[in-house]
Amino acid sequence: MSLRGKNVTVHDMTLRDGMHPKRHLMTLDQMVSIATGLDEAGIPLIEVTHGDGLGGSSVNYGFPAHTDEEYLGTVIPKMKNAKISALLLPGIGTVDHLKMARDLGVHTIRVATHCTEADVSEQHITMARKLDMDTVGFLMMSHMNGAEGLVKQAKLMEGYGANCIYVTDSAGHLLPEGVKERLGAVRKALKPETELGFHGHHNLAMGVANSIAAIEVGANRIDAAAAGLGAGAGNTPMEVLIAVCSLMGIETGVDVAKITDVAEDLVVPMMDFPIRIDRDALTLGYAGVYGSFLLFAKRASAKYGVPARDILVELGRRGMVGGQEDMIEDTAITMARERGLKV
């Protein structure tokens, strides 16, 4: 089908999902440099927070170089056209965090839950709407729920007041057919005025293909990150997505050359290691494991002598989901003991 002339809002993840491979240690100067570059390139919406959202600073998830208030308060005044969003996971972020973000000028709040637990988002979505924010319901790990189940969860979030619903491939596990099945069903079930979004990861190199598949069935918000900087093998690479959209006639309002320069000149030099599909990132996608588990598994591997790939496969077998990072070390210890390794 032709998508020529279709308008899509691209939402940048470099400064939020990209915090995972940076161990949440981006400097304020790095944040401002990349955000202003994205703004200049025409990116309309940029997410800025700890990798695990507002309030994510903790022993479990990692301590950032600066507070959410410092990151947001530094970046927002520098924006000429782009709006700033923030992620919030109920149980990590609170209503007070939400109000703080709004007072600092955050435009969009994305309330994220596991794809079967939308009911825990009611308080935060309701409050965000009362504060007149662009309010997004964000269903994570969507490969773990079928189309019918996702429809029920999406309708809950819409009922709480969300004006946009995201179906999120947190593990980079879905293929285009699975994306179309899930997002197509959700699109048909939502009110016409409720927007639909897709967030992809590149663990099986499907980020761009899945994003186009999502657009084909009605998604009009698409997440991506410059140079793919994000958890696992990264998010959908923004510069590649923009180039493909341009070739297909999909309107994003983003300059291909400028976003490519942001990726090449600003983001790649900042990487602590190459964001690529190595064997462990591939295992994330293949086994359907939450993307931010990757570095935790690698650290546990170095500590206990169990290959990270084996740990990730076991986490997938156990059905571990985002928020259970503390179980990764426990799993590695159990596996090491079973293999007769010294713990």
Curated annotation (Swiss-Prot):
Highest taxon, organism lineage: Bacteria
GO biological process: catabolic process; L-leucine biosynthetic process
Entry-linked PANTHER family: 2-ISOPROPYLMALATE SYNTHASE 1, CHLOROPLASTIC-RELATED, HOMOCITRATE SYNTHASE-RELATED
Pfam family for this entry, one: HMGL-like
Active-site residues, record numbering mapped to chain: H20 (proton acceptor)
Protein's recorded name: 4-hydroxy-2-oxovalerate aldolase 1
InterPro entries: 2-IPM_HCS-like, 4OH_2_O-val_aldolase, Aldolase_TIM, DmpG_comm, DRE_TIM_HOA, PYR_CT
Highest classification ranks of the organism: Bacteria, Pseudomonadati, Pseudomonadota, Betaproteobacteria, Rhodocyclales
The keyword Membrane is assigned to this record: no
Site annotation Transition state stabilizer: residues: R16
Positions contributing to Mn(2+) binding: D17, H199, H201
Gene3D superfamilies in the record: 1.10.8.60, Aldolase class I (3.20.20.70)
Membrane-traversing stretches: none
Paired cysteines (S-S): none
UniProt keyword terms in alphabetical order: Aromatic hydrocarbons catabolism, Lyase, Manganese, Metal-binding
EC number: 4.1.3.39
Annotated family: Belongs to the 4-hydroxy-2-oxovalerate aldolase family.
Catalytic activity: (S)-4-hydroxy-2-oxopentanoate = acetaldehyde + pyruvate
